Every structure is written in structure tokens, then in C-alpha cells.
């Protein structure tokens, strides 16, 4: 399956605990769509978040974010994992 990296430019009031809950919800909802949210990185000060996701399509990845918590990414790009 393709691997995608998404970027959320600014999530107002971003907190580590709330983000961990949102990621857990992505994992839960994603199971029903064949989508696996693998990891995420964030900067609490700027509200910027990056998510790494294994999904059959960009639309499937977006659908999971929308259904899980409504925080849809500003950008989504297909990536290849390196060594």
C-alpha cells in the first residue's frame, strides 16, 4: 500500500495529550477502512502536526481523519521510506 505524509499547518490549542487521543481514534477508525496511521510528530508551540499513514488512497486517509476527529490535513503527499 502507498505511504503518505500529511501536514496540518496549525491546530489551535494543540496539546500532546489531546493529540495522542486523536491519533488513537485515527487508528481505531482506520481499521475499518484499511488505513493504518503509523506515527505522528508535532510542535506544540506552532500547532503544526505531521502524520505518517499507510493507506490505499489519499482519499481514504482523509476520510479517516474527518471521521475520527475532523482535523483534516492541509497537505498530503505520497512518500517512500528510506534507510
Residue spans for each PLM region:
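Short S/T/G/P-rich N-terminal loop/turn motif that feeds into the first structured element of a domain
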Residues: 1-32, 36-38, 42-47, 64, ...
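Short hydrophobic/aromatic beta-strand micro-patches
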Residues: 9, 52-54
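An amphipathic, aromatic/His-enriched active-site/gating alpha helix that lines ligand/cofactor pockets
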Residues: 56-83
Amino acid at each position: 500500500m502507498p505511504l503518505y505524509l500529511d501536514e496540518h499547518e496549525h491546530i489551535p490549542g494543540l496539546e500532546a495529550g489531546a493529540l495522542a487521543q486523536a491519533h488513537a481514534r485515527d487508528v481505531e477508525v482506520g481499521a475499518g477502512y484499511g488505513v493504518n496511521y503509523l506515527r505522528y510528530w508535532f510542535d506544540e508551540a506552532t500547532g503544526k502536526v505531521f502524520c505518517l499513514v499507510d493507506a490505499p488512497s489519499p482519499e481514504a486517509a482523509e476520510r479517516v481523519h474527518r471521521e475520527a476527529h475532523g482535523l483534516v490535513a492541509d497537505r498530503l503527499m505520497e512518500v517512500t521510506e528510506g534507510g
